Design a protein with these regions (language model features):
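Residues at the starts of beta-strands that form the adenosine-phosphate
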Residues: 2, 34-36, 133, 166-167
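Short histidine/acidic/glycine/proline-rich micro-motifs that form metal-
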Residues: 10-13, 88, 141-145, 176-178
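Glycine-rich phosphate/pyrophosphate-binding loop and the adjoining helix
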Residues: 28-30, 145-202
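Helix-loop-strand module that forms the ligand-binding subsite of alpha/beta enzymes
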Residues: 64-156
Length: 202
C-alpha cells in the first residue's frame, strides 16, 4: 500500500509526528507499506500566490514556482492513501499546511462548457486524486475539544474539495508538552486502530 503522510507540524518528533507514525504502524499490521512522508517545514515549498496558472482559463500551465511541490503532486497521484497531520495553531491548521493545500490546486482540473458565442455556461472541477482514502491527525494543548472546531472544519473542507474519502480521524487533546502523547495509551491505540482500518477499507 502506497501512503503519503503530510506532516504539517514545524517540529519533528512532535505529538502529531508520533501519532502519524502510530497510524502507519497500524497500516503495517495489515499490509506492506511504501511510505512517502513529507515534512512540510523541511521541504522547499514556496508560498502560493494564487496566480491560477494551472487553470484552464489561463492555459493550464505548470506552476511557475518550481520547487519540491511538483514532485510531491506527481507522487501524490500514485498514492493509495493520504494522511494529513497538524497541531492546533491559533484554532486552525498550521500556516505550512494551509499553504500546502493551496499548492495542491493543480490537482483540480477544470472542465468548462461554452455556448456558441464562446461564453462559459458551465464549469466543474475534477480532482486528479478523487476517491483516495484519507486520515486526519490533530493534536492540541487545550483540553477542550471545542478549541479545534475550526481546525477540523478546515481539514474536512479541504478533503471534500479534492473528493478524498475520509476514513478516520485521530484527535488528541491536552498535550501540554512536546511528545506528551507517548504517555497516552488510549490516543496511541486510536491512531494504531485508525491505521489498521485505513489498510482494510476498500
Amino acid at each position: 500500500m502506497k501512503i503519503m503522510a503530510i506532516m504539517g507540524s514545524p517540529r519533528k518528533g512532535s505529538n502529531v509526528d508520533i501519532l502519524i507514525d502510530e497510524v502507519i504502524k497500524g497500516v503495517k499490521s495489515k499490509t506492506a507499506v511504501e511510505l512517502d512522508k513529507i515534512y512540510i517545514y523541511e521541504s522547499d515549498i514556496k508560498y502560493c500566490t494564487g496566480c491560477g496558472a494551472h487553470s484552464i482559463l489561463q492555459g493550464a500551465k505548470d506552476c511557475p514556482l518550481g520547487d519540491d511541490m511538483d514532485g510531491i503532486l506527481k507522487r501524490m497521484q500514485k498514492a493509495d492513501a493520504l494522511i494529513f497531520g497538524s497541531p492546533n495553531h491559533g484554532r486552525t491548521i498550521t500556516a505550512g499546511l494551509t499553504n500546502f493545500f493551496a499548492r495542491m490546486m493543480p490537482m483540480l482540473k477544470m472542465q468548462i462548457e461554452r455556448d456558441e458565442e464562446g461564453n462559459i455556461i458551465h464549469a466543474e472541477t475534477k480532482p486528479l486524486i478523487r476517491g483516495k482514502k484519507a486520515v486526519t491527525v490533530v493534536s492540541q494543548v487545550d483540553f477542550a475539544a471545542s478549541s479545534s472546531a475550526l481546525l477540523l472544519m478546515v481539514l474536512d473542507a479541504n478533503l471534500r474539495d479534492f473528493h478524498l474519502r475520509k476514513v478516520g480521524e485521530v484527535f488528541s487533546t491536552g498535550n501540554l508538552k512536546r511528545a506528551q502523547v507517548k504517555e497516552k495509551e488510549a490516543d496511541l491505540n486510536l491512531a494504531f486502530e485508525t491505521g489498521a482500518r485505513l489498510a482494510v477499507i476498500k
